[in-house]
Amino acid sequence: RFVDNALTIQQLVEEAWEKTCGKAVQTVLHVQIADRINETRTVRCRCDCLTKAEIREREIAEYDAARLRERRRRECFRVTDPKKQELAGNMEKWTFANDDRKRPDLSDAMQRYVEQFQEHRRESRGLLLYGDVGTGKTYLAACIANAVIDQGHTARMTNFASIGNELQQTWEKQEYIDELCKYDLLIIDDLGTERKSEYMQEIVFNVIDARYRAGGPLIITTNLTTDELSKPGEIGYSRIYDRILERCLAVKGDGQSRRRQAAIKGWEKMRQQLGMEVHAH
């Protein structure tokens, strides 16, 4: 008897038997191949018991993975304000599949960002979604968060009002910020709507600066205009926005993207990767 190219089977030994059905599930073949004597190959046999066990094992693994994704999703949109619990629950369902695609160019670009997330994560490249109220910036940011969670990553979506409240409730402020920066993707929603005070400005800077230094992509949504971002009027906010614009591609909420001239160069390549047109500032 021969196997493949004149492989002479010398012995059939060491069969392993399935205890339930009594069928062989593994056979070790000692074969002679050219000048190699007694080379061992293991041939796996199939039986219904083994197949059922493997299916069950796969089902358990898929169930555990689904539970992990849902746990990460709840953590991503977690809020401490009881009035916002319902909104947080809804955000878990904000996905590209449910997108109304009123801005198809922008939706497609955001999906490409997710598809290329490994590269953008490695290069610490994020997005600054800016534009008028109601243009879907928060929705698309949540879509990105849900999509990267489905890929197996961690994400956290929050805002500086919530961060400020949570920091007031802990003595370990730096530890809190460090934990915030450990997520694979950090999303800050509604930048600029937090109350204006020296204390809050310090919080905003500390979080942005910590993420900047730690690396990893940052996504920001804001109603601020590019003029307000480039000329904030306060030195404190100027250094904050400079860090954001160094690491985040500015994308207008209506689907058109723009690049601040003073920001880091080289965004053209990323625009091409996302399939977006290049516009002059």
Question: For each predicted feature, which ranges?
Answer:
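Short glycine-rich substrate-engagement loop in P-loop NTPases that contacts/grips substrate
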Residues: 102-111, 145-185, 195-202
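Pre-Walker A adenine-sensing motif
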Residues: 109-121
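Walker A/P-loop nucleotide-binding motif
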Residues: 121-141
